[in-house]
Amino acid sequence: MSQPKKSLSSLLAPYLTLDPAAERMIGAITTDNRQLDADTLWLAARGVSHHALDYYHGEPAAAIVYEPPYPAPPAGALPCPDLGAHLGDIAANYYDHPARAMTVIGVTGTDGKSSLVHFLAQATGGAMLGTIGYGPLDALEVASHTTPDPLRIQQHLAAWRERGIKTVAMEVSSHALAQHRVAGVDFAIGVFTNLSRDHLDYHRDLEDYFQAKARLFARPLPCAVINIDDAHGRRLLDDNLVHPDTRIIAVSSAGNHHPRAAATVSAGNIALDADGIHFTLQYEDAKRDNHAVSSHSAPVTSHLLARFNVDNLLNTAACLLALDTPFTDIPAILATLHGVPGRAERIRLPNGAAAIVDYAHTPAALVNILQGIRPHVPGKLWCIFGCGGDRDHGKRPLMAQAAENYADVTVITDDNPRTENPADIIADALRGTGKRENIWVKRPREEAIRWVLPQLQAGDAVVIAGKGHEDYQIIGTTKHHYSDQETVRTWLTSP
């Protein structure tokens, strides 16, 4: 994708007033000095522990713009205060604001982001950007981060604009919001799914985590979709943290309403069985011209598993309604949505049991998947999980507590131990258990799965939690190929 050259002054306005003698024509932009050449602008921002200029070794560049202070910047480098916060806007300017040529939906929250952006990409025929990958569903690139850096985001959006893609659903992580990675993205819809303990190795506490998420809704979005069954979702509305010009669609699977919402999407008559999910989709919209309430309802049947997918389907419906999809079309669209890799992904066993592979790696997510799967399981519910190394130690006992409370049998194993001793990680988790009845420790991870599968009887299920779609395991600092799905399927085909 070729991009016409732009003047340095046009890219940096209004953040930096350029001396005419410093004017340059810029053919590319980068934050990586390894990609520099005489045509490229280097945007050298300050990171958490290092400054980008620390890695500079005299590579040629069209110009260098850096974030002050820095003790000895290269000769001719231009200081730009708060450059890190402006990278997204500069990149959007360079690529001619691609988000303005499409509808971009930003999804934030602890759980449900990946499923929702995947469902939206299915429903709209557009692209997705998130943990599972970047791009249209038939050409997904492997994701390096849930939300990539600001330049990569704008590069993706510009490439998809050239392909004629009209809708993009994007996961917006708390890290991305705190680090201004989505600056320069003009969102048409912002979605809040829920919030529970996660990423407290990065955020000071849960309040700091919430405030990072809330940044998305301080923008003047055309529409916000808010889960009001979640206490933090209600707080966004109660504390007026959503921009006053934003139209709010409340979502509830528990019959809740909120006075600030212009419309409500809800579910009634929810039933879960071996075939999937059944509910009545309900939509109430206060018309903006005369404030008359318009109500609609229709039955929905989905082959997806788990109670939490009712919420994912409601969020999908709310976004489609915000995109002016006729209500009468939505039940059929929801019925066609297929499962997301590593999200309540069912692998049927020959004897009538099932293995459910899920990405749940927080205490709340583990509760949700176990509670969500339980109605589909007439027999015994097993749970295999581990906890990531070099991450929030405090959630480890909470994970074990969740498994002990909501599964019949719990097996604690490895996740991504990274540089920690796996036995120490498991010991941390075990502190959250009570009598430790029906709790086993089996490692490594593939051995835990192979130990459980032959014990499952007809009607039983095992939730294999934590890795989901991932096809690797990090041991030390090395990524090794590993997949929960492959482990199950290899066992199925073994003699």
Annotated model-derived regions:
Residues 200, 483-495:
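Short, flexible loop segments at boundaries between secondary-structure elements
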Residues 87-228, 233-246, 323, 376-377:
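Phosphate-binding loop of NTP-binding sites
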Residues 57-60, 75-76, 219-222, 244-247, ...:
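P-loop/Walker A phosphate-binding loop and immediately adjacent motor/lid segment at beta-alpha junctions
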Residues 358:
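Conserved phosphate/oxyanion-binding catalytic-loop motifs
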Residues 38-39, 60, 70-75, 163, ...:
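Acidic, Mg2+-coordinating active-site environments of NTP-dependent enzymes
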Residues 47-49, 174-175, 197-198, 230-231, ...:
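Short glycine-rich anion-binding loops that position phosphate/pyrophosphate groups of nucleotides
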Residues 1-89, 231, 266-268, 289, ...:
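N-terminal leader/targeting and accessory segments in enzymes
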